[in-house]
UniProtKB/Swiss-Prot annotation:
Organism encoding this protein: Burkholderia mallei (strain ATCC 23344)
PROSITE patterns: IGP_DEHYDRATASE_1, IGP_DEHYDRATASE_2
Segments forming a coiled coil: none
Protein name listed in UniProt: Imidazoleglycerol-phosphate dehydratase
EC number from the UniProt entry: 4.2.1.19
Length: 195
């Protein structure tokens, strides 16, 4: 079973993440940031990973620390659940539309953190959620999961649709990348022999 639990406690946030990479999309989400919960639900459902995330943060200031630290802790949990990366497909990609919006996400479990985030948001907020926090979420994730991640919103007018397609595509790309390839069982997916 590829499961992991990570707890992160700082002076700003207290976060617990449990993940099962071979789940069915079940989720229990309580971050204190409703729109973030909605986006994390997309990862669980479209990535077919089970997620249990609880966060308490200094949201009386703003949502920045909570959103970023959930990304960090989720990245740590994914890295722990994937382990030595033997037998995984390593690469994943997905295109996801939602009405007028279309996004592409490509991920590489390379061991080299990197983020290319290109989303020309059409507004600064979705309800009370600051769209800039999505960058902080994914930056925290890649730095602690050890992945390279390319995110491109190819078109979109509605900012909610833009970001929802990003999170759905991320879930599907993650699912593809961590899937076990029976033809490569026990092998590191690299000609170098390590990641």
């Amino acid at each position: 079973m590829r499961v992991a639990q990570v707890v992160r406690n700082t002076s700003e946030t207290q976060i617990s993440v449990k993940i099962d990479l071979d789940g069915t999309g079940r989720q229990k989400l309580a971050t204190g940031v409703p729109f973030l919960d909605h986006m994390l639900d997309q990862i669980a459902r479209h990535g077919l990973v089970d997620l249990d995330i609880e966060a308490h943060g200094d949201t009386h200031i703003d949502d920045h620390h909570t959103v970023e630290d959930v990304g960090i802790t989720l990245g740590q949990a994914v890295a722990k659940a994937v382990g030595d990366r033997k037998g995984i497909r390593r690469y994943g990609h997905s295109y996801v539309p939602l009405d007028e919006a279309l996004s592409r996400v490509v991920i590489d479990f390379s061991g080299r953190p990197g983020l290319e985030f290109h989303v020309p948001f059409t507004r600064a907020r979705i309800g009370t959620f600051d769209v800039d926090l999505s960058i902080e979420f994914f930056r925290g994730f890649v730095n602690h999961a050890g992945v390279t991640l390319h995110i491109d919103n190819l078109r979109g007018v509605n900012a909610h649709h833009q970001l929802e397609t990003v999170f759905k595509a991320f879930g599907r790309a993650l699912r593809m990348a961590v899937e076990l390839d029976e033809r490569a069982a026990g092998q590191i997916p690299s000609t170098k022999g390590s990641l």
